[in-house]
From Swiss-Prot:
<keyword id="KW-0472">Membrane</keyword>
<dbReference type="InterPro" id="IPR037268">
    <property type="entry name" value="PSII_PsbT_sf"/>
</dbReference>
<dbReference type="GO" id="GO:0009535">
    <property type="term" value="C:chloroplast thylakoid membrane"/>
</dbReference>
<keyword id="KW-0812">Transmembrane</keyword>
<comment type="subunit">
    <text>PSII is composed of 1 copy each of membrane proteins PsbA, PsbB, PsbC, PsbD, PsbE, PsbF, PsbH, PsbI, PsbJ, PsbK, PsbL, PsbM, PsbT, PsbY, PsbZ, Psb30/Ycf12, at least 3 peripheral proteins of the oxygen-evolving complex and a large number of cofactors. It forms dimeric complexes.</text>
</comment>
<feature type="transmembrane region" description="Helical">
    <location>
        <begin position="3"/>
        <end position="23"/>
    </location>
</feature>
<dbReference type="Pfam" id="PF01405">
    <property type="entry name" value="PsbT"/>
</dbReference>
<dbReference type="GO" id="GO:0015979">
    <property type="term" value="P:photosynthesis"/>
</dbReference>
<dbReference type="GO" id="GO:0009539">
    <property type="term" value="C:photosystem II reaction center"/>
</dbReference>
<comment type="similarity">
    <text>Belongs to the PsbT family.</text>
</comment>
<protein>
    <recommendedName>
        <fullName>Photosystem II reaction center protein T</fullName>
    </recommendedName>
</protein>
<keyword id="KW-0793">Thylakoid</keyword>
<keyword id="KW-0934">Plastid</keyword>
<dbReference type="InterPro" id="IPR001743">
    <property type="entry name" value="PSII_PsbT"/>
</dbReference>
<comment type="function">
    <text>Found at the monomer-monomer interface of the photosystem II (PS II) dimer, plays a role in assembly and dimerization of PSII. PSII is a light-driven water plastoquinone oxidoreductase, using light energy to abstract electrons from H(2)O, generating a proton gradient subsequently used for ATP formation.</text>
</comment>
<keyword id="KW-0604">Photosystem II</keyword>
<keyword id="KW-0602">Photosynthesis</keyword>
Amino acid sequence: MEALVYTFLLVSTLGIIFFAIFFREPPKVPTKKVK
């Protein structure tokens, strides 16, 4: 059960950081920056 909680926390933290960086930068070319 602990592994599940730690995995969820890790994923949520990475998601928050990703969204923070994504919304921080001005979306100049969204299609090229996605992949």
